[in-house]
């Protein structure tokens, strides 16, 4: 039996990351904490870039969030 394939809504992922960053942290600060550029983070938050596993893991570790939550919004 093949596992089901799920489409990832990158716009929703970007919105969750933007919400996680909040209004008290700049994109530059957030990007620095996860090891990416501010311009890359900006594109991610707008859903224009897909995010690799390494970056998702860095966000999860740094901000104590599960990969499931980052990708689906469900804990």
What kind of region is each of these model predictions?
Residues 1-23:
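A short, Lys/Arg-rich alpha-helix, primarily the initiator
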Residues 15, 24-25, 51-54:
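Residue-level signal for the short linker/turn that defines the boundary of a DNA-recognition helix
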Residues 18, 28, 57:
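Residues within the helices of the helix-turn-helix
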Residues 23-46:
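Short alpha-helical DNA-recognition segment
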Residues 39, 49, 68:
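Key DNA-contact positions within bacterial/archaeal DNA-binding proteins
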Residues 54-69:
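DNA major-groove recognition helix of helix-turn-helix/homeodomain DNA-binding modules
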Residues 69-75:
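Short amphipathic recognition helices of helix-turn-helix/homeodomain-type DNA-binding modules
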